[in-house]
Amino acid sequence: MKKAGLLFLVMIVIAVVAAGIGYWKLTGEESDTLRKIVLEQCLPNQQENQNPSPCAEVKPNAGYVVLKDRHGPLQYLLMPTYRINGTESPLLTDPSTPNFFWLAWQARDFMSQKYGQPVPDRAVSLAINSRTGRTQNHFHIHISCIRPDVREQLDNNLANISSRWLPMPGGLRGHEYLARRVTESELVQRSPFMMLAEEVPEAREHMGSYGLAMVRQSDNSFVLLATQRNLLTLNRASAEEIQDHQCEILR
């Protein structure tokens, strides 16, 4: 029994190391690609030529751009026009920082424009990955379709999600998540990053270890979903895992 336990522990350690190596390979010399697109292409082109290309939209005064992602027919990214690496940035808990999740929700209309018809709100999800769950070191929120199985699970747990951060029953995609219900008025007034930092014990000191997602519910409320990195369970806190960039939910 002791040998079996030791073997299991060794396997876990190997898996954790492999996950770490994989992460560093993914975040090598190309990890600044999105930042270069925003700061060296989209922003200058908008300022000099009033043309957001290659972005779909550039709002210098509001501090963000929207870019069509190369993965998936309808996936877009919302990014700041200045340097923010990701969820670990203290700027995200500064009240003067734009409410990027609310801005990303407004940008969902780009999905409908690309699709050629309205994409139902129930099919849309927003997600940002943790520091170890991302491949780019420029803050970006994924605007894309939700996985049908995640949509069903959230629908089935509508009554179980409260206005406090509580464990999502059964987790999502094999990982533990905290879920919190928010109204639209709450979301307009306060960033989900601030809600997480201020309401979940010790979250403020470890924001970079969290991935965060947002989905609209059938009662017109929103549910925030937060997952924290735990390499022992092979969870890199990539909240993007709740999304389906091929948009099966629309078929």
UniProtKB/Swiss-Prot annotation:
Highest taxon listed in the record's lineage: Bacteria
GO cellular component: plasma membrane
Known EC number: 3.6.1.26
MF terms in GO: CDP-diacylglycerol diphosphatase activity
GO terms for biological process, alphabetical: CDP-diacylglycerol catabolic process; phospholipid biosynthetic process
Keywords: Cell inner membrane, Cell membrane, Hydrolase, Lipid biosynthesis, Lipid metabolism, Membrane, Phospholipid biosynthesis, Phospholipid metabolism, Transmembrane, Transmembrane helix
Residues that span the membrane, as ranges: 4-24
Record's subcellular location: Cell inner membrane
SUPFAM superfamilies recorded: HIT-like (SSF54197)
Record membrane topology: Single-pass membrane protein
Record pathway: Phospholipid metabolism; CDP-diacylglycerol degradation; phosphatidate from CDP-diacylglycerol: step 1/1
Catalyzed chemical reaction(s): a CDP-1,2-diacyl-sn-glycerol + H2O = a 1,2-diacyl-sn-glycero-3-phosphate + CMP + 2 H(+)
Main location: membrane
Family named by the database record: Belongs to the Cdh family.
Entry protein name: CDP-diacylglycerol pyrophosphatase
